[in-house]
Amino acid sequence: MILLLGASGYVGQVFSSELRRRRRSFIPLTRQAIDYTSFDVLFNYVRKIKPEFIINAAGYAPKPNVDACELAREEVLCANALLPQTIARVCLLTNTPWGHVSSGSIYVGAKVAAEWGRMRIERDLNQPEMRRLFAEHPEKIYGFTEWDEPNFSFRHAPCNFYSGTKALAEEAIRGVGQSYIWRPRMPFNERDETRNLLSKLQHYARVYDNVNSISHLDEFVRACLELWERQAPFGIYNVVNPGAVTTRRIVEMIQRILKPDRRFEFWKNDEEFYRYQAKTPRSHCILDASKLLSLGVRMRPVEEALEDALERWQTASPSAKFAGAGVR
């Protein structure tokens, strides 16, 4: 039996659906049912039910974007950094394997092939040289691997508070007990929801263009479960669709497939975006998914996954989509 924490959240709901599809016995927990942020409460509960695996899909859900985290720092810290440590301690003491949904937003930029086989890190993927390289020679740009230290964190400022807490959690739980750390990036699928990247882009008044790795949410969840079911080595995994994509390219696909009745406008440059829109730094990065693929866990190339999601797009009613930020 599997214990699923954060079952009512954006990611947790997809874990619930996939576990049901696989006919897996599981208990979907929310904080309304049990205060699993309390060590004593969670420890006693785990000892009582003895799950074979625990999934932590709980965390602070920033809405409409990560700027919201700056106004709720205590809550964000508790949900994104302290809760994973509590779960890690409980799992260590009860000898329970578990998986933690982290984030790829603890990096910024990418690695670029330089002279003599060396690599250099470029934090700004929007500079003209990098955009030209991505368009003409993408093979010279490499994503961050699981062995690269996060460079968008409290230890490597500047960063936003959300990313800082996610990196802090990884640092605290890495190597503690039998644990997986799963890193998604900018999740999307065919369902119209506020945290879906494709929904966000369709509702932004102006779009900020950059280069990113992204994750088809359903494929992310399946990949996470496959790692556990295949008894893959515990550790960190970048769970993203292979490749990278510009925001402008995604918008082009939206226009071609969905044909929305609107024009898309873009911020002219980073300076304009940060002057008039963003309150905190943003993470834009490319992640390397080779470790995942080497274990036979497959995710579709990024543009194939995007095309499929848009071809099967399901528009939701406003009441079904919009809810406040908070812990799930």
PLM features per residue range, with description:
Residues 14, 223-226, 230-279, 283, ...:
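Mid/C-terminal beta-alpha module of Rossmann-like enzyme folds, strongest
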Residues 20, 24-44, 59:
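Adenosine-cofactor binding site in Rossmann-like domains, unifying the SAM/SAH pocket
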Residues 5, 29, 54-58, 98-104, ...:
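SDR active-site strand-loop-helix element
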Residues 280-328:
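C-terminal amphipathic/interface module of NAD(P)-dependent oxidoreductases
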Residues 159, 170-222, 226:
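NAD(P)-dependent short-chain dehydrogenase/reductase
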Residues 39-81, 92:
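NAD(P)H-binding glycine-rich loop region in Rossmannoid oxidoreductase-like domains
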Residues 71-78, 82-83, 105-182, 189:
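Catalytic helix-loop patch of NAD(P)-dependent Rossmann-fold dehydrogenases
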Residues 1-21:
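N-terminal Rossmann NAD(P)H-binding glycine-rich loop of SDR-like oxidoreductase domains
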